[in-house]
């Protein structure tokens, strides 16, 4: 949480979500659990497009915290983003700088450093939970995973961040039945889930609480 100040000569603040409230955190956690449990029963893969800095670490923390409860030992969790791997390593190496002892590490986490590591993931037909960038699906390794999994009805895509107009991620959120990836039309048969409550921006209550301390 941001530190609170009581004095300032001038306050400049962002207000991206100043006119709305985020979804309840517990509701978000329950929805994530439900999606993953259902995906396990259907024997598919789960794709999570995520920003490399911040959002990925929040997802990893969430999965590690609920590792036993969600029966995640049945999955292989792939972190397929060189930048996200480097950023996450900082979290793991500096637990003393974080609340509650830092970010726990998933025992079944696989770090996919190279392009060859990333390509090998797409040989898995089930049991792969893949976290990769970019967060809006406009580039990065997630695009390849989408190409290999979107057409499969047993697979799931969990959208955990804002998707700007015109992006591939936004097309998925909007329910497009076909998307264009690498000059190919890919049918969208996977289930697309939009999970709120994980925004890095404070909502109206957060902003009022923060500036109310002055």
Model-identified regions with their sequence ranges:
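C-terminal regulatory/interaction regions
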Residues: 65-68, 107-214
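Short, conserved secondary-structure transition motifs
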Residues: 54-55, 76-92
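Short, surface-exposed amphipathic charged segments that create phosphate/polyanion-binding patches used
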Residues: 90-98, 207-210
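Polar, glycine-rich mid-to-C-terminal structural blocks
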Residues: 101-102
């Amino acid at each position: 949480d941001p530190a609170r100040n009581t004095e300032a000569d001038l306050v400049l603040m962002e207000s991206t979500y100043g006119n709305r409230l985020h979804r309840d955190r517990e509701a978000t956690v329950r929805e994530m659990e439900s999606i993953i449990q259902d995906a396990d029963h259907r024997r598919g893969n789960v794709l999570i497009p995520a920003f490399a800095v911040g959002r990925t670490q929040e997802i990893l923390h969430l999965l590690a915290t609920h590792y036993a409860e969600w029966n995640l030992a049945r999955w292989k969790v792939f972190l397929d983003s060189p930048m996200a791997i480097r950023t996450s390593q900082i979290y793991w190496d500096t637990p003393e700088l974080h609340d509650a002892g830092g970010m726990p590490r998933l025992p079944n986490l696989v770090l996919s450093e190279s392009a060859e590591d990333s390509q090998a993931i797409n040989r898995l037909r089930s049991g792969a939970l893949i976290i990769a960038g970019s967060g809006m699906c406009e580039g990065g390794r997630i695009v390849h995973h989408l190409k290999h999994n979107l057409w499969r009805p047993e697979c799931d895509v969990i959208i955990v961040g804002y998707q700007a107009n015109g992006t591939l991620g936004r097309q998925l959120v909007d329910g497009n039945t076909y998307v264009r990836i690498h000059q190919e039309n890919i049918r969208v048969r996977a289930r697309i889930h939009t999970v709120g409550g994980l925004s890095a921006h404070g909502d109206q209550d957060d902003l009022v609480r923060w500036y109310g301390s002055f």
